[in-house]
Amino acid sequence: MMTQSIRRSMLTVMATLPLLFSSATLHAQANSVQQQLEALEKSSGGRLGVALINTADNSQILYVADERFAMCSTSKVMAAAAVLKQSESDKHLLNQRVEIRASDLVNYNPIAEKHVNGTMTLAQLGAGALQYSDNTAMNKLIAHLGGPDKVTAFARSLGDETFRLDRTEPTLNSAIPGDPRDTTTPLAMAQTLKNLTLGKALAETQRAQLVTWLKGNTTGSASIRAGLPKSWGVGDKTGSGDYGTTNDIAVIWPENHAPLVLVTYFTQPEQKAESRRDVLAAAAKIVTHGF
């Protein structure tokens, strides 16, 4: 597989095609995808980053995939996975209970707010963070791990040298242009998501739990999922923040094809811009066409 740095004006498409396809055909297809993504980005008025990994042969479709984007709530996958990793050596860990106080609540707590003055297990916090994007649940996972830097350290243990988590919810969603805090690149996130859900980064039981949580996500119907055939399986985690930042990362199971891993990150120049899940759906449709 070729490796190269992807610049704004470039798209890398490395796909296994039948031998009857000529190099000219491959070039034309690559140009078509590039042109469609460039047109989508231009019409949206924002900055779009896309990374798709075809696990059948580890070929990739990359667009602005080595630029940093604010992760927002897509970072919850890493925090939940870090707790799952700990549970490999402590089979009772996910049943450990964490106290939920009114003072713990932040700006979005659809699950945690039901447990104020009570407790939640780490398993419930993982499900709440990934399936409902509960911000208090995320903060409790981070606190259990020992802080944002411990989430970053877990990423480093997986070989991800790009991911960085610096803050907790909700400040990690500020998404200020040029601010490196709480960012990664589409390609780095795609590679790590692949390792966590389809690779050996987690033991089988923990990997299955992570995939189950992602497949049960309730927040992604208008994002990547909206750009895919309804018959395909999807597990995803969305994210949103200031500057109209709109994200989704997903593992996709097409019919009769090996899984795909897709990361779509999008942000805009105005701090109060609205989210654009339609851009993510359109990008997903473009890059998965033909699978």
UniProtKB/Swiss-Prot annotation:
One of the GO biological process terms: beta-lactam antibiotic catabolic process
Signal sequence range: 1-28
Catalytic-site annotation from UniProt: 73 (acyl-ester intermediate)
Highest taxon of the lineage: Bacteria
Keyword Calcium carried by entry: no
Residues binding substrate: 237-239
Xref: InterPro entries: Beta-lactam/transpept-like, Beta-lactam_cat, Beta-lactam_class-A, Beta-lactam_class-A_AS
Presence of keyword Transport: no
Alphabetic keyword roster: Antibiotic resistance, Hydrolase, Plasmid, Signal
EC number per UniProt: 3.5.2.6
GO molecular function, one term: beta-lactamase activity
Catalytically driven reaction(s): a beta-lactam + H2O = a substituted beta-amino acid
Record-linked Pfam families: Beta-lactamase2 (PF13354)
Family the entry assigns: Belongs to the class-A beta-lactamase family.
Job description of the protein: Has cefotaxime-hydrolyzing activity.
Note: The class A beta-lactamase family has a specific amino-acid numbering system, sometimes called Ambler or ABL numbering and often misspelt as Amber. A multiple sequence alignment was used to derive a consensus sequence and then the consensus was numbered taking into account insertions and deletions. This allows use of identical numbers, e.g. for active site residues, despite differences in protein length. UniProt always uses natural numbering of residues, hence there appear to be differences in numbering between this entry and some papers.
Protein name, entry field: Beta-lactamase CTX-M-6
Gene that encodes the chain: bla
